Regions:
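ATP-dependent carboxylate activation and anion-phosphoryl transfer catalytic cores
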Residues: 224-294
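Glycine-rich phosphate/pyrophosphate-binding beta-alpha loops
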Residues: 58, 132, 196-199, 267-277
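Phosphate-binding site of ATP-dependent enzymes
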Residues: 145-242, 262
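A short, glycine/Asx- and small/polar-enriched loop/turn
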Residues: 45-50, 117-120, 174, 256-262
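Active-site nucleotide/adenylate-binding loops and adjacent lid/helix of ATP-dependent enzymes
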Residues: 2-9, 71-75, 82-175, 229-230
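Conserved N-proximal alpha/beta basic substrate-recognition cap immediately N-terminal to
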Residues: 4, 10-110
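A short beta-strand motif that forms the metal-chelation/ATP-contact edge
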Residues: 49-53, 125, 178-182, 260-272
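Short secondary-structure junctions
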Residues: 32, 101-102, 118-119, 241-248
């Protein structure tokens, strides 16, 4: 019997993202019929698929509530609705920190609260946002940057967003982020992601409420070190304890610091998985999907 899956995407990318070609081929090789569907297409019949896999739904930030409502209507969804509802607001980092896992230090400023800014270089961004949309990098020592950061935070507050303020970790400019990818709770591969915010500029000020999907990323394969893998294992243990079982897919982004790596973000909803940077990755993803359909 033919097994069928839908790969959910957004209207700007109806055929999927950069992972789509390799993923389509790997699923087909495993005897799985895959088709791309726009998540908010009113004519899509999600019930006819054995599984719906969230992939490049990168416009969900325009109306997160509608997106969460959609996940609740899909009969068989990966990752599950409760995971997606938790993961699509970066306040989940509070839970990660409360579990004793190292994360980037973050101040949370809800609408209506005064905006207090740190010294040095820092980042201001919304708690709900995809890629670097809405993020700004500022330097308190540069003329006008503190005022620009307050304006940026105010714009996000006016849109009803909770603001995150984090120190800018300079090691990302040289070492980059490490993105750890997992399928069914097993480590698959990692890549290096270059810094995405220009130095001492308010990128997010002009585009804080932009619906553009992403900035160009500089991606290269990377072998993670033991400390990064241990940090990833800690996060997976938290996810298992919180939600039960393994997730079909997960990406954990970590940053270097002088005291060891810290978590910057958990991508459990619609991550780029950079399948082209590891020869076995697409096959491992397809095998994990096949196991779910067995």
């Amino acid at each position: 019997m033919t097994r069928s899956v839908a790969l959910a995407t957004c209207s700007q990318m109806p055929s999927g993202d950069d992972d789509s070609r390799l993923l389509d081929a790997a699923l087909q090789a495993d005897g799985i019929e895959a088709s791309w569907r726009v998540w908010n297409d009113p004519d899509a019949d999600w019930s006819r698929f054995d599984l719906v896999i969230v992939r490049s739904t990168w416009d969900y930030t325009v109306d997160r509530g509608a997106f969460i409502d959609w996940t609740r209507r899909v009969p068989r969804l990966a990752n599950p609705t409760d995971v997606i509802a938790w993961n699509t607001d970066k306040t989940y980092l509070r839970d990660v920190s409360d579990a004793g896992i190292e994360v980037v230090p973050t101040a949370w400023i809800e609408p209506g609260r005064a905006v207090e800014l740190p010294g040095g270089e820092f980042v201001v961004k919304p708690s709900v946002g995809a890629s670097s949309n809405g993020a700004g990098r500022f330097d308190s020592a540069a003329a006008g940057q503190l005022d620009a950061a307050r304006v940026h935070a105010g714009m996000l507050h006016d849109a009803g967003r909770t603001v995150m303020v984090q120190p800018y970790l300079a090691d990302v400019d040289t070492a980059g982020e490490t993105a750890l990818s997992y399928f069914d709770g097993k480590f698959s591969h990692a890549v290096r992601k270059g810094a995405m915010l220009p130095q001492s500029t308010a990128y997010g000020l002009a585009s804080g409420l932009s619906t553009s999907l992403s900035l160009p990323e500089r991606i290269t394969p990377r072998q993670p070190d033991a400390a990064e893998l241990r940090l990833g294992d800690q996060v997976l243990d938290l996810i298992r304890d919180r939600f039960g079982g393994e997730l079909l897919y997960a990406r954990i982004d970590v940053l270097p610091t002088p005291d060891g790596p810290v978590v910057i973000e958990l991508e459990l909803t619609e991550p780029s998985l950079f399948l082209e940077h590891d020869a076995a990755a697409a096959g491992q993803f397809a095998a994990a999907v096949s196991n779910r359909l067995a």
